[in-house]
Amino acid sequence: MNAARTYGLPVTQAPSLGVTDFAALGTYVRLVTTDATRIDEARDLLQTGLRALDEACSRFRPDSELMSLDDNVGGRCVRVSPLLAEAVAVALRAADLSAGDVDPTLGNALAAVGYDRDFASVAAFGPAVRIVTRPAPGWQRIRLDKAAGLLTMPAGIRLDLGATAKAFAADKAAADIHTRLDCGVLVSLGGDIAVAGPPPRGGWVVRVQDLPGRSEDEPTGPTSTVAISAGGLATSSTAARRWIRGDRVLHHVLNPRTGLPATSPWRTVSVTAATCVDANIASTASIVRGSAAPAWLARLRLPARLVGADGSVVTVAGWPASADCALEREGDGRPEGPAGPKRRAVR
């Protein structure tokens, strides 16, 4: 996605709000605070956190901690930083809760279809490449002791944390900024949105759009404006991060069962949940699950908006609405709390 573009566009405006935009992690970042006087401090905190995440988790930096694993693990147990351990734990949880629809062991598969560098450097057109069906090695082969900071994975596996890293960063940054500065905050990383603290009156108003575009531009394609007061909103799409090799259109949402770009009736899926990470797990898995996604999301009671390849829109579970549902496996037998189901299954 172009650094000046996003899917979830925070459009709440008021004189008391602080707003700042910049580029990071190969995408567009918007930060909003309910106290305009704290926006500079908040920006410093966010930029510091994003730099640390990039240094730990980037697949496109040869000096990142993640890339060093290719040379140093190879079936051995190695010590990793607390930040990388946390990011890997988030990715493994996503794989578990999505029954493998969101799998972090797709690094080699993404490189094979042409996504082997920051997306801004991926050529839009190129000669045909040999594309082979090859399932992901499988997230179950990764062993992580998060408390001890120890990671073990077989030789030949390349991790890609891109499916969850931005959502993880948004949740982490929003919570940290709220705690440190005692104000409401919204963090949007390429449309993965997390909020924390007291919202502005009427909630955080966000425009969700099918095709990317700048907030000041007239949106292209179907749009929806929603207000969220807590948790997160995430959008997964095959409409922007796409490229052509020969006569084949490729995109970055892979089906772990084939290692190839997912064939889906949905070009965009937006979900609200208790956290941005949970919303992102559900939105990405929905692209992979295809026609089964609406019933699955409805069963989880996760408000969602799905846009078909023809531009048709399907909404489920009361969209537009915020959700306080977090994700866990179906059929775990846990009782529901008095306020209704706080956790919902994902299988």
What are these regions (language model features)?
Residues 1-347:
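Mature catalytic core of soluble alpha/beta enzymes
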